[in-house]
Amino acid sequence: MPLTLTLNKISKTYDDELILSGLSYTFNEGGTHILMGSNGCGKSTLLRICALLEQPDAGNLVFSASGKGELPQDLSLRRRITLVLPKVGVFNGTVFNNVAYGLKIRGIAKDEKTERVGKMLKFTGLENKRTQNALTLSSGEAQRLGIGRALVIEPDLLLLDEPTVSIDNKNRELIETMILQMKETGRTTIIMTTHDNSQAERLSKKLILMKNGRISLS
């Protein structure tokens, strides 16, 4: 079930530098929201806070779902949220095992795990590489693997931090197609950062401009 996330006056400081300054915004469930802004405006910091990997210095986050109201910020909620970084980390093992990692630690049964990973490898265009060592993938293929690893656990909130930066056009187009297909299902709330204005317009009408640690336009 997709999540709605409301940010209430979020502030964050690093080494006496104010990164986020009283930021408030609501990301509605099932939408694809694109965060834009210059380097250092706080986009990546905001995603880490949304992923519950960091705490704000001030303000609070409210997660909710239709028919369930506000949700407690516990381990159960954390497992419904995934963050994909600009450069995905892969481990020494097959592409299949890399994608299956999140299902394994959640104790998903073998048959279900095999089925879900198989579908995700097809979705990400990595079906013919399932037995290949993930360390041998190109940067673009590794990025697709990372998104597949995030999606296979069926998250309710997917956070994508510059998912197509520094990869070739072919893999960028494949990842954009994946995001558009996810968007059509409405089953996952997506928040993504990008510097590419054209890409932002291709992926969503919900464009959010950050400046000086705040939302300046949406």
Show which residues each predicted segment covers.
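The feature captures the beta-strand-to-loop junction immediately N-terminal to the Walker
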Residues: 36-38
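Helix-to-loop junction immediately C-terminal to a conserved catalytic motif
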Residues: 51
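ABC ATPase NBD coupling module
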Residues: 68-82
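Conserved ABC ATPase "signature" region
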Residues: 111-129
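Conserved ABC ATPase signature
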Residues: 133-137, 141
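Conserved catalytic motifs of ABC-family nucleotide-binding domains
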Residues: 154
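Catalytic Walker B motif of ABC-type/P-loop ATPase nucleotide-binding domains
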Residues: 158-161
